[in-house]
């Protein structure tokens, strides 16, 4: 079984892999980093005009990093908008994924947080810098192989 976007991508010979459907019937697609930007543009033109959320996670120590995009096709007069989840996996050594900021502006802070916490570089992002951690911070705190520095915060006693 294929979702509508997946069927459309197959029809137009665009490389992707269906990872199945979740409990709400939303299909998850796997896209290669080098194909992501063109498929993102195509998804927008197809009608996925809203990036509901973007997040990232570390699959396993030493494994791939994943950037996840939840897209929604919002149309006037439609009670159940069509949704799709897209996962882009990147190698840990040099995790680079094209930014979709220029397609969906809501990707701005979300991609920055994924960069800050996991070290995924989003190519062509206009302000890719740390958003939660200080600029001087070393490492990527949400990676499973991250080793926390040995320091203690001094707090007021009163």
From Swiss-Prot:
Give the main EC class.
Answer: translocase
* Main subcellular location: plastid
Q: Which residues form the signal peptide?
A: none
Membrane topology type, per the record?
Peripheral membrane protein
Q: According to the UniProt entry, what is the EC number of this protein?
A: 7.1.1.-
Q: Which UniProt keywords apply?
A: Chloroplast, Membrane, NAD, NADP, Plastid, Plastoquinone, Quinone, Thylakoid, Translocase, Transport
Quaternary assembly: NDH is composed of at least 16 different subunits, 5 of which are encoded in the nucleus.
**Protein family membership:** Belongs to the complex I 30 kDa subunit family.
Q: What protein name does the entry list?
A: NAD(P)H-quinone oxidoreductase subunit J, chloroplastic
Task: Print the organism lineage.
Answer: Eukaryota, Viridiplantae, Streptophyta, Embryophyta, Tracheophyta
